[in-house]
Amino acid sequence: ELGAEVIGVALDPFSERDNYVLSGIGSKIKADLRVDIRDGERMKAIFREYQPEIIFHLAAQPLVRLSYEIPVDTYATNVMGTINVMEAIRATDSVKVGVMITTDKCYENKEQIWGYRENESMGGYDPYSSSKGAAEIAIASWRRSFFNPVDYGMKHHVALASVRAGNVIGGGDWALDRIIPDCIKALEAGKDIDIRSPKAIRPWQHVLEPLSGYMLLATKMWEEPTKYCEGWNFGPRAESITPVWDIATDVIKIYGSGKLNDMSNPNVLHEAKLLMLDISKAKFQLGWKPRMNIHRCIELTVDWYKRYKTEDAYDICLDEINQFINE
């Protein structure tokens, strides 16, 4: 609605109930392309054809437990896919801004009781987390080697930054091993909700929170190309960093029905128990801050799932965006 010409590059949707499918986004943008980012030459060809100016790179294999099953594919997508996007940027003169989205799990997790800052070590126990840490290292290398702010205007015209969000929730997500989709699937089927890691603490936030940060950052990078080419955290308020059990309990209250089962198992695949982000940098240097508390984030998310069967998904999204803007 703001007038941007959007070109989308992705694999097929996860399900026919995805927000992307139900809201008909593919028919509302300039181009909707089915491409695997592991195909570097195809990515370069797309960039040559469409001559984009701003890149938001979100494509990934995003699931921790699945990464144990397909570690090579996870690395190929999350590391080499990211490099392919940066190489396509490097080969296309039209690109001026690149915002590379990774994850809060890119940090070497020490289960510390304070939030990670942007200058802390990259790492990761599982293939997913470590692949994102590796992607961050690659982004930093490409920024220093090919998109160095010192050389802007002489050797290149690209501002490149990376962003790390917390655990994102929102309507229309049906992915595996995610707490909100798992809750909704069980509730719709009239079943109890099984919680495998009830005490795990995460920085929960509604999807519109980090997206607003990404867009603000891209705008500032466009206006001042050498000032913001760094890593940035976009996380929730401190009180929104809560255990999985509390999230599921709130979902049940808002949805109006349901029962939780504690399915804790010490023998399951390793997942971090405690993860928090420090967002001071984005607050003070960008003027960004989260608008909603955790209850409001869950309320807006559950609202989508309660409405999507009887209302137009695109209209629901516009309504929720307007609610978010007015928070």
Can you annotate each of these PLM segments?
Residues G40-E41, E53, R65, V72, ...:
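Residues in well-ordered alpha-helical elements
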Residues E1-A165, I169, F324:
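N-terminal Rossmann-like NAD(P)+-binding domain of SDR-like oxidoreductases, especially those catalyzing
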Residues K44, E87, P181, T249, ...:
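Active-site phosphate/pyrophosphate- and oxyanion-stabilizing loops and adjacent acidic/basic residues
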Residues I25-K28, N119-S121, S145-L160, C183-I195, ...:
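A short C-terminal helix-loop "cap" of Rossmann-like NAD(P)-dependent dehydrogenase/epimerase domains
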Residues T82, L176-P181, Y214, A248:
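Amphipathic alpha-helical segments in well-structured domains
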Residues G3-V9, V35, N167, L187-E327:
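C-terminal substrate-binding subdomain of Rossmann-fold SDR/epimerase-dehydratase oxidoreductases
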Residues D18-V21, K110-I113, D173-D177, V207-L208, ...:
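Short aromatic-enriched loop/helix-cap "lid" or pocket-rim segments at secondary-structure transitions
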